[in-house]
Every structure is written in structure tokens, then in C-alpha cells.
């Protein structure tokens, strides 16, 4: 039976969506093609009508998950007043609900350790999406050069994702909730940039001479 291009596109999207959820739940190597196709209501043999390889599916499924996260962030950032935008995204990201439901959450905390061991092609696709996430934040860090905004945004994203990983390791516990709360504060602090450190007082000349003599003695 021949299917229309529209039907094929819908089926393709359904497979990608199923794979996206299962990969985040079980990891890149925890999902078999046969089981995935069965869950999508299709036969194992139909897989290659949609994907050239398992790697192609993995890349597309990762991309789908990350694109959805970025789009949610951009929507939230665009809808709120400037002074509330970053806090709203951080608050919605670092929640017990997100911690406890990796299958429908951000792909980076769920899969980044595995992606680092995948092929260069897979890592490149993942990195491009990760950069888009950083840019989504950088667009809303005002009053600084773009390079500085990206640096702060990268620190924010890294803090948020690292916090979620730690919170999941700690499980549903008081300590895990404490990690989430601390991560929120730290992520928002990243947006403001580092506080200026006090300048170190110059060393007295006598101290420099003593230090030099001590160093010379140690070299003997």
C-alpha cells in the first residue's frame, strides 16, 4: 500500500517523538529499534523507510527534544516583562516536576554524558542545539557587549543543567530540593556577572627581597 507524503511525514514525526521521550528516560543505548517501532505501531522493517541509520534517528530525536526546550524558553522570555524573564525560565526549569520526569524534560542533563562518547557527527548536532540554548538567554542579558552576554548565558545554562543532574542523583529528597533552590540562586547570579574582587595590596619591597632570598636558598 502506498501512503501519501503527508502520512509518511506524520509517521516520521511520531517515531521521532517517541524516540525523543524514550531516549531521555533510558539513555542513548537503552532503546532498541524494534521496541521503539512497536511502540509507534509500526514494524521493525519499516524503520529504514524513515531513517538511514540508528544514529540518524538519535540525532533527530535529540534535536527534537532540544528544539522544544529552546522554543519554550524563547516563548517565556518573549512574553514577560524584561525584569522577570530570566527568573521565570530558571524557576520553571529547576523544579521537582522537571527533576522527576526526565522523559519530558530537557535533553541535556538526561543525555550529555552519553553524547560526549558518541560520534563526532552526533556531538556536532548536539553542540549546535546547545549553542542555540545559550543564545536564547544571551538575547535577554542587557547592557553588556554580546560576548559578555554569551559568557554569562553559558554560565547560567551550565549551572541550571548541572543543578538538575545533581538533584536527580539525590532523588526526591530534602537534599535534592535544597540543591534546586541553591541552583536557582546561582544561575541568576551568573546573569549579573561576577562581583568585582578587591584589588590585592602591593607587597612591600622588603617582603619581595625576603621572598627572593628564600627562593634562592631552596634552589641550592
PLM regions with names:
Residues 2, 39, 147, 191-220:
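Polybasic, lysine-enriched low-complexity intrinsically disordered terminal tails
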Residues 60, 74-105, 153-156:
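Hydrophobic alpha-helical connector segments
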Residues 14, 18, 22-56, 60:
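Helix-turn-helix
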Residues 16, 87, 130-138, 184, ...:
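An amphipathic alpha-helix signature
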Residues 120-128, 140-203:
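Hydrophobic/aromatic-rich alpha-helical bundle segments in the mid-to-C-terminal region
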Residues 85-88, 99-127:
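Amphipathic alpha-helical segments used for helix-helix packing
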Residues 63-69:
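Short, basic, alpha-helical segments at the C-terminal edge of helix-turn-helix-like DNA-binding modules
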Amino acid at each position: 500500500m502506498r501512503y501519501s507524503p503527508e502520512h509518511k511525514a506524520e509517521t516520521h514525526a511520531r517515531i521521532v517523538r517517541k524516540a525523543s521521550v524514550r531516549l531521555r528516560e533510558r539513555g542513548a543505548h537503552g532503546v532498541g529499534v524494534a521496541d521503539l517501532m512497536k511502540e509507534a505501531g509500526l514494524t521493525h522493517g519499516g524503520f529504514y523507510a524513515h531513517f538511514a541509520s540508528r544514529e540518524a534517528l538519535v540525532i533527530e530525536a535529540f534535536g527534537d527534544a532540544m528544539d522544544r526546550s529552546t522554543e519554550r524558553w524563547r516563548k517565556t522570555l518573549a512574553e514577560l516583562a524584561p525584569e522577570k524573564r530570566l527568573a521565570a525560565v530558571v524557576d520553571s526549569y529547576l523544579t521537582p516536576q522537571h527533576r522527576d520526569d526526565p522523559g519530558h524534560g530537557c535533553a541535556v542533563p538526561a543525555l550529555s554524558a552519553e553524547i560526549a562518547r558518541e560520534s563526532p557527527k552526533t556531538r556536532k548536532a548536539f553542540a549546535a542545539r546547545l549553542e542555540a540554548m545559550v543564545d536564547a538567554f544571551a538575547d535577554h542579558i542587557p547592557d553588556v557587549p554580546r560576548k559578555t552576554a554569551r559568557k554569562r548565558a553559558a554560565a547560567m545554562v551550565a549551572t541550571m543543567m548541572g543543578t538538575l543532574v545533581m538533584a536527580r542523583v539525590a532523588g526526591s529528597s530534602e537534599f535534592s530540593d535544597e540543591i534546586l533552590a541553591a541552583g536557582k540562586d546561582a544561575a541568576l547570579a551568573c546573569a549579573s556577572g561576577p562581583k568585582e574582587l578587591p584589588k590585592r595590596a602591593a607587597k612591600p619591597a622588603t617582603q619581595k627581597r625576603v621572598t627572593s632570598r628564600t627562593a634562592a636558598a631552596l634552589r641550592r
